[in-house]
């Protein structure tokens, strides 16, 4: 099966597993997916993740996080798509829900959150919004 947008597939898998309250999910791994999972962990949206080495590309196992009666991730949206890339300059980096959510950006300094990009004064491609 050929994937046309592996990042969107990962975000959709997380969104679907979150809706049915699965404890964990597995997606094919890549460097950018690991960096996105690291940001989600650091910002408190997922409990943890681990990279499982196989003889192909590897597997990323993501452990989801839930509150007592609610989901931690309420919204997950892919912004820049293969058919329509969305780039922003340093002074145009968006705030998601006035700071309640995060924007994940791919920059020349790596994959960063919107706060980190503003602090470093760098723009880039908006990968996704997480609320």
UniProtKB/Swiss-Prot annotation:
GO terms for molecular function: rRNA binding; structural constituent of ribosome. Gene3D superfamilies: 3.30.1370.30, 3.30.1490.10. Disulfide bonds: none annotated. Keywords: Ribonucleoprotein, Ribosomal protein, RNA-binding, rRNA-binding. InterPro entries: Ribosomal_uS8, Ribosomal_uS8_CS, Ribosomal_uS8_sf. Part of the 30S ribosomal subunit. Contacts proteins S5 and S12. One of the primary rRNA binding proteins, it binds directly to 16S rRNA central domain where it helps coordinate assembly of the platform of the 30S subunit. Belongs to the universal ribosomal protein uS8 family. PANTHER family: 40S RIBOSOMAL PROTEIN S15A. This is Small ribosomal subunit protein uS8. It comes from Geobacillus stearothermophilus.
